[in-house]
Structures are given as C-alpha cells and as structure tokens.
Amino acid sequence: KEIEEGARAIGAGYMVIGDAAMARRALNAVREAFDAALTFDDPQVHADVTKPQKIVAVTGVTGTMGQETLKQLLPRGNRFKIRAFARPSEVNREKMKKIAAPNLEVVWGDLGNYEDIKKLVDGADYVLHIGAMVSPAADKYPEKTLYTNIGSTLSIIKAIKEQPDPDKVHFVYVGTVAETGTRTYPIHWGRVGDPINPSIFDYYALSKVFSELAVYESGLKHWVSIRQTGQYPSNE
C-alpha cells in the first residue's frame, strides 16, 4: 500500500508510517493505556460484553518493550486475548510465570521457525512484531541477526496471507530510528521523512531496513511501521 501524505505522524516517542487511520488509532491506544488504571480486580475487566475478544499476537514479550506492552494489554481482558510468543528458555519461562493471566496464552517457539510463527498468527486479529535480535548481540552475530529479524518478518507476512481472510488482520511492525542513521550531536533529532541511511556495520539497523521494506511491499491491507526510539524499563 502506498504511503499516504497524511500518514506521517510523530507521537508518544514513535515515528509512524503506513496506514494513516491505523497509525492514529495506535497512538491513541498508547495514550489511553497510560491514562487507564485498570487491574484484574476492576469490574470492567471481567464485564460481560456482546463482542468476542480480539486476539492480539505479540512477539518479543520478554524484552523491555514487550513487557510494557503486556502490562498495557493484559488488564483489558474484556476486550483482548493476548497470545504471547517467547523463546522457551528457563529465564523466559520464569518471567512469563510471573505475569500469568486468564486472557494470556503463551506460544513457545523460535522466530526463525515458520511453523512456530504460524501458530502465533493463526486466528489473530492483530499482530505486533516487537521481537528482534538487538545490539550488542546483533553486533556480535550479524548473520544470525539478519536471518532472525528479516526472516521472522517475512514469516509473519506469509502467515497472515495464509489466513482465511488476510484483510481482517492488522499488522504492527516495530522498526527503529536507527534505520535513518546516527543521531549524535549536533544533529540529534529525526523526522519521518529523513532518508534511509543506516550506520556502517550496524546490522541491526540494516535488518530493520530490509524488514520494513518487506512490510511496505507485502500487499497487506492493514499495516503500520513504528520506528521506535529508545525506552527504559518502568522499574528502573
């Protein structure tokens, strides 16, 4: 889908391109999440609703951004069923045990395995692709970074296209401002229209450039790419 002129927006610390209406909804959802104070004891969470829960599939749930995403989505148990994708390591299993919830399903798998990705995507209404190999691991293992980050994105696109009704699936891809290169002083700001220019030897950024291009050229009806900047865990 061609990028509409009105689709360019900056908000909540993200650069957004793609489906304009979806971008606005994504930013509004972020703002609403921070304003809300729902818990599992809140009657709103368990309220009976006539509409079925939407299934939100999320990768990267054990990382900083993924953990914060779960914190915002899980309290909305009356609206969303969360399907979280995680690598089955001991550390990840312990981490996911701590956030067990009635509306949380964990899909254990590998981002490099298409069958695992398909289990995550099947039946989902929304797919949030946060998971990726990042620096410093990306600097140490460049080939694995390219394989994992690009391959997982292509697998998600393929899995969405294989759904009975691909047009009902909304894909949120998380990229990075590193796609447009360094932001060292004195030019330490960025804009959506900046040219793609990843820094030399930055394989993480390069993998994100190719992945975003794959999303852009995918032909999916509903997609958006959020070029995230940086973030800190809420407990630090």
Q: What are the residue ranges of the model-derived segments?
A:
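NAD(P)H-binding glycine-rich loop region in Rossmannoid oxidoreductase-like domains
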Residues: L104, W108-T148
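Flexible, glycine-rich beta-alpha linker
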Residues: E179-G181, D202-Y203, W223-E236
